[in-house]
């Protein structure tokens, strides 16, 4: 039975001063702004599960410790007892392993888990105190201890994994180290049930090298002058041992000779194939990178069909977010509190709806603090011009997202907005009945201060083109002849584009102006 992560707690790790995530049991889709910490979450899981001290030292504590915590200390008391600590805790489902169960966690509760703690080494208290007294802007990274341990306070290493983790990072596909690390981890996972088998492989590989040297190199060494005492042989080092010379092949071609997109697909496929049996947790870093749309759809389908193990996927892609169910989305913001926004409470019906329809920038909407939803392409074409006319700003300057959403989808988006607490203005047609189409239809959202429905109150002006025509009659008649209104109704996007490209000013309909002014407050 696979082990699951039930909670992640970060203290002074990279950008996070204090952060808590309670992940879903199966799939977790991390979306967020740039620098919001998506990759940091994956790194935290991968680092703690690895128990690899050498890797930790290679990264360096100065690159892992939260810079705000360091600055605050340096500019503050500079007292030994106030030195910040770095801590990553992974709370686990019941593992039936007594060595991981205990109360050595920040919750002070008996449960299963593993952690990384970096803190001042008490053995160097005197040296640290003296350095802090004599050196300005000094922080004693080199006097910190770093320890991987379980909640039972037992140390562990990569050879005694408590959580089996597979990481596929699209940003490092061209890295020889990343490929070797992936292959080695995969090999360990495939052979974890029989450590004796690993010893046999190593022994046979060493014998093969010895036989090659003893037999095949004899003619070559025979040409070396005997008085030189030199011979040709094979390298004998960690870099040339059996595990470091393994390679994964597809159709007789090694994966390091495959394209980057193909490497992503193969590595993810390998990890998914044994999720739940040899792998507990799979971490995917922006799998959409380097993949064509068709191959991305194949990869998403393969991920969706995976029944075992726990997935963490960092992405910017709406296809991934919607096809793998919006309920699984976890939203990180750069300026958020100590918890992310989760969509696990989104109705199953709405999640299913977005899984079936085109992705339609749903990730951008979920991340946006302020959004304006418009009903069709004609409104969308002209909306930036309207916005600049009303505010003398561009929407992006004010951090506002404009999205073209079919009218039937408005309520689906508003369901998401209620969870993200984003500010949303809906610009919609009254379709000839204000009460039914604009008031009663959105009654469930009327008490939400972050949602506003904007529409023209004149029921004779039932659609955007008619409102636009009567607010700009002279200009429209000039551009589209005497039957301008009918032309605009029959050629909505073409008419909107023509209005956008002409040089004269356009009067902004009152309900659109209302939406723009409200969203900017």
Label for each model-derived stretch:
Residues 1-49, 242-364, 380-381, 388-390, ...:
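Switch/communication elements of ASCE P-loop NTPase nucleotide-binding domains
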Residues 43-108:
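Conserved P-loop NTP-binding catalytic core
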Residues 62-79, 347-367:
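Surface-exposed acidic, glycine/proline-enriched linker/cap segments
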Residues 79-83, 106-109, 139, 272-277, ...:
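Conserved catalytic network of the ASCE P-loop NTPase/AAA+ motor domain
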Residues 87, 94-210:
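Electropositive, glycine-dotted interaction segments
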Residues 94-97, 119-124, 152-153, 288, ...:
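Conserved nucleotide-binding/hydrolysis micro-motifs of P-loop NTPases
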Residues 186-266, 270-281:
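Extended helical coiled-coil dimerization/tether regions that scaffold
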Residues 361-372, 380-521:
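Acidic, Mg2+-coordinating catalytic modules of nucleic-acid enzymes
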């Amino acid at each position: 039975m696979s082990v699951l992560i039930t909670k992640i707690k970060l203290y002074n790790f990279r950008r996070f001063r204090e952060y808590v995530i309670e992940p879903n049991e199966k799939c977790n889709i991390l979306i967020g702004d740039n620098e919001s910490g998506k990759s940091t979450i994956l790194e935290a899981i991968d680092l703690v599960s690895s128990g690899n001290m050498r890797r930790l030292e290679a990264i360096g504590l100065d690159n892992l410790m939260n810079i705000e915590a360091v600055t605050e200390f340096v500019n503050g008391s500079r007292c030994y007892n106030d030195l910040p600590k770095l801590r990553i805790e992974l709370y686990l489902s019941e593992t039936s392993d007594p060595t991981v169960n205990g109360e050595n966690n920040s919750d002070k509760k008996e449960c299963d888990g593993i952690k990384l703690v970096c803190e001042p080494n008490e053995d160097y208290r005197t040296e640290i105190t003296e350095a802090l007294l004599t050196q300005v802007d000094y922080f004693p990274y080199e006097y910190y201890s770093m320890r991987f341990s379980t909640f039972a306070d037992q140390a562990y290493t990569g050879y005694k994994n408590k959580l089996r983790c597979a990481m596929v990072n699209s940003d490092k596909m061209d890295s020889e180290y990343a490929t070797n690390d992936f292959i080695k981890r995969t090999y360990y996972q495939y052979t974890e049930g029989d450590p004796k088998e690993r010893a046999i492989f190593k022994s046979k590989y060493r014998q093969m090298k010895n036989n090659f040297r003893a037999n095949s190199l004899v003619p070559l060494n025979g040409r070396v002058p005997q008085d030189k005492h030199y011979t040709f042989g094979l390298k004998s080092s960690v870099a040339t041992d059996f595990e470091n010379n393994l390679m994964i092949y597809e159709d007789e071609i090694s994966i390091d000779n495959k394209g980057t997109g193909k490497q992503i697909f193969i590595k993810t496929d390998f990890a998914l194939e044994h999720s739940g049996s040899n792998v507990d947790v799979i971490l995917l870093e922006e799998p959409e990178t380097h993949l064509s749309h068709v191959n991305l759809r194949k990869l998403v389908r393969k991920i969706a069909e995976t029944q075992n193990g726990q997935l963490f996927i960092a992405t910017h892609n709406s296809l991934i977010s919607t096809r793998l169910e919006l309920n699984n989305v976890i939203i990180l913001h750069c300026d958020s509190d100590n918890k992310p926004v989760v969509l696990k409470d989104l109705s199953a019906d709405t999640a299913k709806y977005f899984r079936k329809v085109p992705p339609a920038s749903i990730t951008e909407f979920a991340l946006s603090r302020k959004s304006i939803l418009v009903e069709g392409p004609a409104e969308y074409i002209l909306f930036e011009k309207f916005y600049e006319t009303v505010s003398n700003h561009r929407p992006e300057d004010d951090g506002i997202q404009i999205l073209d959403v079919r009218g039937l989808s408005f309520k689906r988006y508003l369901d998401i907005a209620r969870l993200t607490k984003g500010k949303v203005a809906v610009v919609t047609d009254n379709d000839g009945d204000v009460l039914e189409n604009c008031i009663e239809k959105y009654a469930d959202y009327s008490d939400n201060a972050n949602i506003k429905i904007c529409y023209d109150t004149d029921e004779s002006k039932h659609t955007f083109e008619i409102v636009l025509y009567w607010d700009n009659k002279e200009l429209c008649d000039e551009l589209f002849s005497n039957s301008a209104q009918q032309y605009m109704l029959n050629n909505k996007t073409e008419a909107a584009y023509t209005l956008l490209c002409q040089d004269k000013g356009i009067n902004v309909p009152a309900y659109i102006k209302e939406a723009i002014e409200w969203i900017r407050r």
